[in-house]
């Protein structure tokens, strides 16, 4: 009888322990001690350092693409290094701890009050290593956005983000561990913490919006561009890792703007200017060790795209693509009259859909139009690829927009910004008339946000630029980014952001666009804006916005040299 009673007791205990979702079991082994990165809402100014620390913890190796860190594939991460714990605390003192997978930055579980919850379909690696000293339970929904939004009853486009929302989310997760009640507030809280932690670590655009809301103690709802970033992180990562050395995508990244218009992105430069993507999901190992020829890079201050990787299962496949090429004043590279004859000049013309502006970038380093090669000679022309010296048909496209003929060391140049101008080869002086973009030929209209989350503004021709509080729809804060590397006043696109000279402390002003080296700018993946002619960075003078001076200066690593483009500044 005692044996029967004991068995009945154990059976009842097991049934009661199942709870609403079913208790999870795990072997009694000593779990790994995972690194921890915490954030307390009472310290609003610690949000940015918190994200930097989280990024540092999830990036285990030195794998990069275009200087962006690539997360390690699952096969290269041991169980003992698989997760990072993220305790979040609200002003009431409530704390919940998230478990984040270093392979993909996903939130896979959370814990508080001696209980932990895992999403439906959780893995043995998660259950056996996370929160093993708590009562583990499994939720009846997964952690993807579709499942979470189904639990809430509406999309995350309607769910505010900000300090108040994060406060409530922490309380909702903690309360659920106490009562195991309604899943709607739980799912809503998870949508908030996932975006304010994981997505902000993936995209500086999202980080900036959240950081601004925390600083201003305000709330905002995600715009459609932000949501499309979140939905396309995987495809962005894949395209970047499989891009040609100059950042030319094999496919198209589909985003949406705030008005729900489609944005088709075909190169890294435009994607970065739109999203400021900060971390990549592993897709494949790049086959290219460097995106530069020696001739194209020697004078550059920021060596942007360098691929580095270890031993991977999958190697990226780089394919040929056909795109338009935009240069000085937004004009496109065009075969004169579309004549298919050797020696026909290549010229500038307004961008259109004509076939004589469609260039195929081959993996052998040639750029072709209907099979004929873009050829370096006394001028730039098309020619039969088999009848000219091979070195005359080879080109290197750099991420900064330079197109170089490696044999001569000369770069593709537009002598004038006029329709019909024949292109030439000249020494590289990093001038705007030597800047090009492949694909995405239309200028991008944006705000430029810098030190103390303030916006860059212009005050007309021959005047300085400076920082002021961001104001949506203020035309003086709107800029057009051109494929030639110029930053133009959006309300008057004949005016360019210009350095007065090329020495440290030289002022940055607004002048007529002339295609000079003082008017060409590169948005770097480290958050700086460089002038490749001067080899200096855009800098808020003395870290004092009241001086109303933006200058050129040597790299310091200080926050007054950090910038981000955004279509929604406040």
UniProtKB/Swiss-Prot annotation:
It catalyses: Endohydrolysis of the N-glycosidic bond at one specific adenosine on the 28S rRNA. One of its GO terms (biological process) is defense response. Disulfide bonds join 284-316, 332-351, 373-385, 455-470, 496-513. 1-alpha repeats lie at residues 329-369. SMART domains: RICIN. GO terms for molecular function: carbohydrate binding; nucleotide binding; rRNA N-glycosylase activity; toxin activity. The precursor is processed in two chains, A and B, that are linked by a disulfide bond. A small truncated form corresponding roughly to the second ricin B-type lectin domain of the B chain, TrSNAI, can also be produced. Glycosylated. N-glycans of subunit A are (Man)2-3(Xyl)(GlcNAc)2(Fuc) at Asn-40, (GlcNAc)0-2(Man)3(Xyl)(GlcNAc)2(Fuc) or (Man)1-2(GlcNAc)2 at Asn-62, (Man)3(Xyl)(GlcNAc)2(Fuc)0-1 at Asn-144 and (GlcNAc)0-1(Man)3(Xyl)(GlcNAc)2(Fuc) at Asn-260. N-glycans of subunit B are (Man)3(Xyl)(GlcNAc)2(Fuc) at Asn-492 and (Man)6-9(GlcNAc)2 at Asn-526. 2-beta repeats lie at residues 493-531. Residues 1-28 form the signal peptide. Glycans are attached at residues 40, 62, 144, 260, 492, 526. 1-beta repeats lie at residues 370-405. 1-gamma repeats lie at residues 408-440. The active site is at residue 199. Residues 319-439, 441-566 form the Ricin B-type lectin domain. 2-alpha repeats lie at residues 452-489. Its EC number is 3.2.2.22. SUPFAM superfamilies: Ribosome inactivating proteins (RIP) (SSF56371), Ricin B-like lectins (SSF50370). Expressed in bark. The keyword Ribosomal protein does not apply. Keywords: Disulfide bond, Glycoprotein, Hydrolase, Lectin, Nucleotide-binding, Plant defense, Protein synthesis inhibitor, Repeat, Signal, Toxin. 2-gamma repeats lie at residues 534-567. Neu5Ac(alpha2-6)Gal/GalNAc specific agglutinin. Behaves as a type-2 ribosome-inactivating protein. Strongly inhibits mammalian but not plant ribosomes. The A chain is responsible for inhibiting protein synthesis through the catalytic inactivation of 60S ribosomal subunits by removing adenine from position 4,324 of 28S rRNA. The B chain binds to cell receptors and probably facilitates the entry into the cell of the A chain; B chains are also responsible for cell agglutination (lectin activity). Involved in plant defense against insects. Belongs to the ribosome-inactivating protein family. Type 2 RIP subfamily. The B-chain consists of six tandemly repeated subdomains. Only subdomains 1-alpha and 2-gamma possess a functional carbohydrate-binding site. Tetramer of four pairs of disulfide bound A-B chains. This is Ribosome-inactivating protein SNAI. It comes from Sambucus nigra (European elder). The lineage of its organism: Eukaryota, Viridiplantae, Streptophyta, Embryophyta, Tracheophyta.
